[in-house]
């Protein structure tokens, strides 16, 4: 009887050990499959990006030269691991360049720096009509696919530095244009953007005021503490990911503060226009009002408008309705005051014709 019990006990241990080993292998296989799926998603994004690049040429072929160049920005803000021997290598990223086809030799043209929106996104033909509006007035446009952008594979995606060195990438694109295109007027450079691009506009005009004539920030991400507190907890995962900050805002509040435009409100020294919308379901109006109130608290002079339940929510002045394009016209008029473009729009009808051809 004793031998039987001993045998049963040994069998139980063996089965348990086998089950644990089986569970361990299963977890490894699940992790491997998950990574393969994520890699396929990045491959899909790369294909979509190549198609969209073709669309850029098609949508602007009548008025602009479209180019895409590769630049280098600062190294990652932190090494991927302690044994990364290439941690100090500058990061490579792509940048779009749009130049009016009717530029004249020997003349100077104003430059618009236009960073794209999205925590992980890219400069897509979503902005085609806006770029057409700018080109039609004689602006040169540059748009950086800063670190963290989609369409360039997993490495670029995981190089994200939200509110950090992505701003330097955008500055690199600005400097590239001034250094390499003699047609660009270094005295007439503005930065504009929406949502996350609006955040980058704020960060650059506040931290590097001498590099820009003016700025527009549409529905800009402005305060990470407010944003994380008011959004779904899953949003936090973008920041706590090991390849990004790797800590929550409770663990390192100063790290999140340095990535928030509201922390630099006291530095404003250039003309600025801010737009927000009360029914914005992404960058809530309360977050933008924090930025506006911070600027007011420091007695800064700037322009802003709070739109009341404008159709389109977060994208209210980027969609194609007449209401939306009429609002964009006011943005162009703000830029015109400081940038003196060669061919400013006389009215909203001229602007719509430039963007939509009719």
Per-range role (PLM):
Residues 2-7:
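Sec-dependent signal peptide recognition
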Residues 10, 59-62, 86-88, 205, ...:
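Sterically constrained small-residue positions within well-ordered secondary structures
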Residues 10-18:
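Hydrophobic h-region of N-terminal signal peptides that target proteins for export
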Residues 54-87, 97, 336-358:
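Extracellular/periplasmic ectodomains of large secreted or surface enzymes and adhesion receptors
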Residues 65-93, 98-187, 194, 229:
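Cap/lid segment of the alpha/beta-hydrolase catalytic domain
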Residues 75, 146-358:
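Active-site-proximal cap/loop segments of hydrolase catalytic domains
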């Amino acid at each position: 009887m004793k031998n039987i019990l001993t045998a049963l006990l040994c069998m139980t241990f063996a089965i348990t050990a086998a089950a644990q080993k089986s569970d361990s292998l299963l977890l490894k296989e699940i992790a491997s499959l998950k990574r393969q799926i994520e890699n396929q998603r990045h491959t899909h994004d790369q294909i979509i990006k190549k198609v969209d690049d073709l669309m850029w040429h098609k949508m602007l072929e009548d008025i602009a030269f479209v180019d895409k160049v590769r630049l280098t920005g600062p190294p990652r803000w932190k090494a991927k691991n302690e044994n990364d021997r290439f941690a100090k290598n500058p990061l490579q990223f792509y940048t779009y360049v749009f130049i009016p086809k009717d530029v004249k030799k020997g003349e100077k043209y104003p430059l618009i720096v236009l960073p794209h929106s999205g925590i992980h996104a890219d400069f897509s033909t979503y902005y085609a009509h806006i770029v057409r509006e700018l080109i039609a007035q004689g602006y040169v446009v540059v748009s950086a696919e800063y670190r963290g952008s989609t369409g360039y594979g997993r490495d670029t995606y995981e190089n994200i530095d939200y509110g950090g060195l992505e701003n330097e990438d955008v500055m690199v694109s600005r400097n590239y244009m001034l250094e390499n295109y003699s047609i660009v007027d270094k005295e007439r450079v503005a930065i504009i953007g929406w949502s996350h691009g609006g955040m980058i506009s704020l960060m650059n005009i506040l931290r590097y005021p001498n590099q820009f004539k003016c700025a527009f920030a549409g529905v800009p991400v402005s305060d990470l503490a407010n944003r994380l507190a008011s959004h779904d907890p899953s949003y936090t995962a973008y920041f706590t990911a090991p390849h990004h900050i790797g800590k929550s805002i409770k663990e390192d509040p100063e790290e999140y503060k340095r990535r928030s435009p509201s922390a630099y409100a006291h530095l404003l020294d250039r003309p600025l226009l801010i737009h927000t919308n009360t029914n914005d379901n992404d960058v809530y109006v309360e977050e933008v009002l924090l930025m506006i109130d911070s600027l007011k608290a420091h007695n800064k002079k700037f322009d802003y408008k709070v739109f009341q339940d404008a159709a389109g929510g977060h994208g209210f002045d980027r969609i194609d309705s007449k209401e939306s394009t009429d609002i964009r016209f006011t943005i162009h008029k703000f830029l015109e005051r400081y940038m003196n473009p060669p061919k400013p729009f006389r009215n909203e009808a001229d602007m719509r014709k430039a963007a939509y051809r009719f």
